[in-house]
UniProtKB/Swiss-Prot annotation:
Family classification: Belongs to the universal ribosomal protein uL4 family.
Gene: rplD
HAMAP family in the record: Ribosomal_uL4_B (MF_01328_B)
GO biological process: translation
Ribonucleoprotein among keywords: yes
Region annotation (Disordered) ranges: 51-70
Name of the protein in question: Large ribosomal subunit protein uL4
Length: 205
């Protein structure tokens, strides 16, 4: 499979040959959905906790006597039906993580990259970066490439590139080990360097 290579001015400057094994897969919507849901589930803190009637402070004394008042009987002011009472089915901290096999995870990323390549949303460049942490310089580069709010995948994210991209809305910068399915699915376009492309190819082939 061939992908167009762009220069710094955004013009086509030859092409890059990539393996079909990494970028020629069919679109597997169900697999991508499963992996994205599992990834987001794993990102949940799972720390929420509520108190049952036994755990809420107070409520030890019977509010009024059992008989003779005309009111409904009550044994504690911390009953779940009372304001300020405990929860009937209190939430507990839990792990929301879902198991995803390595083959499934790689298969989902392969499918996403293949679809990006098919839709010409994968922009391959020789290199991307700035010599000083200036947002305007990076914005000018992206404008020349004709991309807006892209995910930038570099073989190495230096401090200047990170700082320059930080103030651009919708722009995200990652290296290859830092890629995840949510970032890829959410990206309008992906700008990737040749070196990073080779790393992805080796990883997913």
């Amino acid at each position: 499979m061939e992908l167009q290579l762009r220069n710094a001015q955004g013009q086509t400057d030859g092409s890059v040959q990539v393996a079909d094994a990494a970028f020629g897969d069919r679109f597997r919507e169900a697999l991508i959905h499963q992996v994205v849901v599992a990834y987001l589930a794993g990102a949940r803190a799972g720390t929420r906790a509520q108190k049952t009637r036994a755990e809420v402070r107070g409520g030890g004394a019977k509010p009024w006597r059992q008989k003779g008042t005309g009111r409904a009987r009550a044994g504690t002011i911390r009953s779940p039906i009372w304001v300020g009472g405990g929860r009937a089915f209190a939430a507990r901290p839990q792990d929301h993580g879902q198991k995803v096999n390595k083959k499934m995870y790689r298969g989902a990323l392969r499918s996403i990259f293949s679809e990006l390549a098919r839709q010409e949303r994968l922009v391959v460049v020789e290199s991307i970066g700035v010599d000083e942490p200036k947002t305007a310089k990076l914005a000018a580069q992206l404008e020349q490439l004709g991309v807006e709010r892209p995910l930038i995948v570099a073989d190495e994210v230096d401090q200047n590139l990170y700082l320059a991209a930080r103030n651009l809305p919708g722009v995200d910068v990652r290296d290859v080990p830092g890629l995840d399915p949510v970032a890829l699915v959410g990206a309008e376009q992906v700008v990737i360097t040749v070196q990073a492309l080779r790393q992805v190819e080796e990883w997913l082939s």
